[in-house]
């Protein structure tokens, strides 16, 4: 990337440069909005690991807005769950741990997730499958010990 002019960079390349510049600036709090924008799936995982490692090792705080479920799962320690109707009547609840927050969010959507045993990524269970029904009965909508 360093050998290219900024004007010639792709969206994903620009995003990686922007993330590098953001984390290269000294701060006590990092506000990062949609770090997954323009990144492919492998780059999203890589970026998540880099961001998380940077925040942990620098002992800083980051507030990250992310709508990509997998990336949010990799990044989050705590989540803010919103309820209600977006842009009309929504409530932001107090931050909770990742597992609690994801369970609250997914219960509202009536969706269950498991962790893929080969790559450990989140996978949606088929609606009304045995696994889906077992997890719902146990109140475990997100990554249930497998």
Task: Name each model-derived stretch.
Residues 23-28:
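A short, proline-enriched helix->beta-strand linker immediately N-terminal to the Walker B motif
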Residues 81-122:
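Conserved beta-strand-loop-alpha-helix hinge in the C-terminal portion
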Residues 72-74:
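A short, surface-exposed alpha-helical micro-motif characterized by mixed small hydrophobic
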Residues 65-67:
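H-loop/switch region of ABC-family ATPase nucleotide-binding domains
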Residues 17-19:
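Hydrophobic anchor residue at the start of the ABC signature
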Residues 5, 32-36, 42:
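Walker B catalytic motif
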Residues 5-9, 13:
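Conserved ABC ATPase signature
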Residues 44-58:
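Helical segment within the ABC ATPase nucleotide-binding domain
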């Amino acid at each position: 990337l360093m050998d290219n002019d900024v004007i010639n960079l792709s969206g994903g390349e620009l995003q990686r440069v922007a993330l590098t510049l953001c984390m290269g600036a000294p701060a006590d709090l990092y506000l990062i909005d949609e770090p997954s924008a323009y990144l492919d799936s492998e780059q999203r995982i890589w970026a998540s690991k880099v961001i998380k490692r940077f925040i942990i090792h620098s002992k800083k705080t980051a507030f990250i807005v992310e709508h990509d479920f997998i990336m949010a799962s990799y990044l989050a320690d705590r989540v803010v769950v919103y309820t209600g109707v977006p842009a009309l009547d929504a409530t932001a609840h107090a931050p909770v741990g990742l597992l609690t927050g994801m369970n609250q969010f997914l219960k509202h959507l009536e969706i269950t997730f498991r962790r893929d045993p080969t790559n450990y990524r989140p996978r949606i269970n088929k609606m009304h499958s045995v696994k889906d029904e077992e997890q719902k009965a146990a109140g475990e909508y997100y990554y249930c010990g497998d």
